[in-house]
Amino acid sequence: TRAAYAGRQKYTFGWTGDSGCSDGVTKGWAQMENQIAVLLSAGLGLIPFTTTDISGYCGDIDDYPAMAELYVRWVQMGAFNPLSRIHHEGNNAVEPWMFGEQAEGYVKDAISLKYSLLPYIYSYAREAHDTGLPIMRAMFLEYPYDSQTFSTDNQFMFGEELLVAPVVK
């Protein structure tokens, strides 16, 4: 949902907004990295169910090969969001096969990984519902006595057990 209201944190999924990278692939990388901070901030604000536009909502794609790695990396990072949804603006699609056979294979692997994690995600979703503790966790939530975790902003814990360090450059 775009809107916020009392109880949102318990019953709905938030969305980080149109991240946009229509100025080119270079801006798209920065936007993907920025989404990590936005998602973690939402969790720290007791909104544990938040997601992003996987693929960056990047406008018309003129050069699929140039966009392929960013698309794959965004899908891989998005597999570790509480909700994964590929969403795009513009007049063309962002289906995995449009980025080439190799990209399609990587995306298939990321989606398969997400499905294999569903029992894990369900357990942490229940915990989030009951306690407000987010599934995507800033490093310092799990390691509060490690001062380096307070300046780590491009990786996160997914639940207690999984460290996620997306490729963002």
Cite the ranges covered by each PLM segment.
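Catalytic-domain carbohydrate-binding cleft regions of carbohydrate-active enzymes
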Residues: 1-169
